[in-house]
A protein has these predicted regions:
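Extended substrate-binding grooves/exosites of carbohydrate-active enzymes
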Residues: 1-250, 255-276
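Short beta-strand elements
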Residues: 279-280
Length: 280
């Protein structure tokens, strides 16, 4: 709570002095949680207006670099509220996935639980969370939601994800017998979840083409097929060598999707740039 009063500013000054005595080269920040006033607001909502009420520490000028935990819809207003102070998103997303599990349909965003302080009685009976990037906590966002905002504005310097790896404890949105978190883009065994490839397609120069989910469903069931790709203009999807059409990213979307009825066989995707095959 001290970040919301003058004690927080005083403590920050004391800590900054200690750090400066040891290291004069690095910027000093704090992960403010939350950076804006959430009082009397439904916690399922994020601020989307420029006149947000920032906490005292954020507005004090003590920090070299303002750090935001969550509140992703306020990011784009940072420059007009703090024109001389750099920004970094110190904790973001809290997206939820279980590797290898997929709920249909995939184009509906879900916030699980509805509120952090209300017991969760929804979700899946086997305590899984869809591995499509469609579920997050109410205080967070999907990975695509936050990265699109950061990517759009040059004055937003970057983001730290909650989290890189799953870990034991905090099995949000579930309770026992769940024991592992669902937050990681890599699971406890070290295997990447699908959203890992979204970041790979955005943050590296490596040609990426990743399609999912698995291809083992009930005959006739409609299945959403996603693809993350980079270094290419388009992707063509094939089932048993029959084309299911060419897709391109639209607007600021970071993935493409086909919705098709399942039938047994082999899926294949080909990405192309200027008509030349890049990945298969």
């Amino acid at each position: 709570q001290e970040q919301w009063n003058e004690q927080g500013v005083k403590t920050a000054k004391e800590l900054k002095k200690i750090v400066r005595n040891l290291d004069t080269t690095r910027l000093i920040t704090a992960g403010m949680n939350p950076p804006v006033n959430m009082e009397n607001q439904d916690v399922t909502l994020q601020f989307d207006k420029a006149n947000v009420n920032y906490n005292v520490l954020a507005a004090s000028g003590v920090l070299d670099l303002v750090g935001y935990n969550y509140a992703h819809k306020t990011f784009e207003y940072h420059q007009q509220n703090f024109p001389k102070t750099p920004f970094i998103a110190t904790e973001t997303t809290s997206g939820l996935q279980t590797r290898g599990y997929y709920d249909q349909k995939s184009d509906t965003l879900k916030r699980w639980p509805i509120r952090w302080d209300i017991p969760f009685d929804g979700g899946n009976s086997n305590n899984t969370v869809s591995s499509y990037d469609q579920v997050s906590t109410p205080w967070g966002s999907t990975h695509e939601e936050t990265w699109k905002i950061i990517k759009k504005h040059d004055y937003l310097s970057g983001m730290f994800i909650w989290t890189g790896f799953d870990y034991l404890g905090e099995p949000t949105p579930y309770v026992w017998p769940s024991r592992s978190s669902y937050f990681g883009v890599i699971d406890l065994a070290g295997f990447p979840k699908d959203v890992y490839y979204m970041y790979q397609s955005e943050w590296t120069d490596k040609p990426v083409l990743h399609i999912f989910p698995h291809w083992n469903w009930e005959i006739g069931k409609e299945v959403d097929i996603w693809a993350y790709y980079s270094q290419a203009d388009e992707v063509e999807l094939f089932l048993n060598e029959e084309s299911l059409g060419i897709k391109k990213k639209e607007g600021d979307d970071l993935h493409i999707m086909w919705r098709i009825p399942f039938k047994p066989g082999s899926l294949k995707a080909i990405s192309r740039k200027d008509g030349n095959e890049i990945s298969c």
